[in-house]
Amino acid sequence: MNSKKKIALVAHDNRKKALISWCEANSEVLSNHSLCGTGTTAKLIKEATGLEVFPYKSGPMGGDQQIGAAIVNEDIDFMIFFWDPLTAQPHDPDVKALLRISVLYDIPIAMNESTAEFLIKSPIMKEQHERHIIDYYQKIRKDNF
């Protein structure tokens, strides 16, 4: 991944205010990267901060899956996902799939403000970084043949 990161910004409804506040506090750093997000979250961040945030669909309308596809296509390097651990979501299976893809493709994920702070302030944010993607095709061949 390049020094200019492609960052996805995602938040469940009860966590949107926290993500917007975090983006406001970190807008200078975020402005140096390409940003995208799920529908409402992207719109609210753009309105609050003036940052350009490419909007995918809303999470329950397929936005989580769109972000997952973008990760697979190497169009997203990094994800800030403030999720609500106390409320069941109608699209929980999509969220689980998004997290699985994020781990599979070795992208950094922050799911709370503390982790987001650690990641965004890391010296690696300004550098190129090599992902360590597990070759599952090799594993499948080895286990089955």
Curated annotation (Swiss-Prot):
Q: Is Mitochondrion found in the keyword set?
A: no
InterPro entries assigned to the protein according to its UniProt record, in alphabetical order: Methylgl_synth, Methylglyoxal_synth_AS, MGS-like_dom, MGS-like_dom_sf
Enzymatic class: lyase
Question: Where substrate is bound, by residue?
Answer: 12, 16, 38-41, 58-59, 91
**Which residues are annotated as active site?**
64
Instruction: Say if the entry is tagged with keyword Transcription.
Output: no
- Limits of the MGS-like domain: 1-145
Q: Name one Pfam family in it.
A: MGS
The chemistry this enzyme catalyses reads: dihydroxyacetone phosphate = methylglyoxal + phosphate
User: Keyword set for this entry?
Assistant: Lyase
Protein family (similarity comment): Belongs to the methylglyoxal synthase family.
| HAMAP family on file | Methylglyoxal_synth
Q: What does this protein do?
A: Catalyzes the formation of methylglyoxal from dihydroxyacetone phosphate.
Q: What is this protein called?
A: Methylglyoxal synthase
To which species is this protein native?
Clostridium acetobutylicum (strain ATCC 824 / DSM 792 / JCM 1419 / IAM 19013 / LMG 5710 / NBRC 13948 / NRRL B-527 / VKM B-1787 / 2291 / W)
UniProt lists the gene as: mgsA
